[in-house]
Amino acid sequence: MSSSNNTVVYWGTGRRKTSVARVRLVPGNGTITINGRPGDNYLNYNPAYLAAVKAPLQTLGLSTEYDVLVNVRGGGLTGQADAIKQGAARALCELSVDNRKPLKTEGHLSRDPRAKERRKYGLKKARKAPQFSKR
């Protein structure tokens, strides 16, 4: 939590795959801004991505009370949307300790450990082997 010009700002960081999102919650009317662009525009108006970003706020019924300002880097839209979700959930935990239990129950605070598996030598991809010839 930090305050600038007597406005309380809550910070949270979220990660998914190679995406890292730094999320700020500022008292407002519920607008979402991602990298300086409107949230729905940035996420290509995809309802699944928008729902993921709004999920932590809707869980607590605060979707119209805070503006979400996001700086996100790396990865694609799926990873970025989930990173924003986790960052927003962590910022809401900073807001009040009572918010932690419902957010944890819904799974918004969990870091998804799945990431791209590394390529191994002798193989074409992580697990795809070259065609086998018996003779």
From Swiss-Prot:
Cystines in this chain: none
Comp. bias regions, Basic residues: 116-135
MF GO annotations: RNA binding; structural constituent of ribosome
GO BP terms in the entry: translation
Region named Disordered: 102-135
Basic and acidic residues: compositionally biased ranges: 102-115
PROSITE patterns for the chain: RIBOSOMAL_S9 (PS00360)
GO cellular component, one term: cytosolic small ribosomal subunit
Entry superkingdom: Bacteria
Keyword Cell division: no
InterPro entries: Ribosomal_Su5_D2-typ_SF, Ribosomal_uS9, Ribosomal_uS9_bac/plastid, Ribosomal_uS9_CS, Ribsml_uS5_D2-typ_fold_subgr
Cross-referenced PANTHER family: RIBOSOMAL PROTEIN S9, SMALL RIBOSOMAL SUBUNIT PROTEIN US9M
Similarity comment: Belongs to the universal ribosomal protein uS9 family.
Identification of the protein by name: Small ribosomal subunit protein uS9
Taxonomic path: Bacteria, Bacillati, Cyanobacteriota, Cyanophyceae, Synechococcales
Name of the gene: rpsI
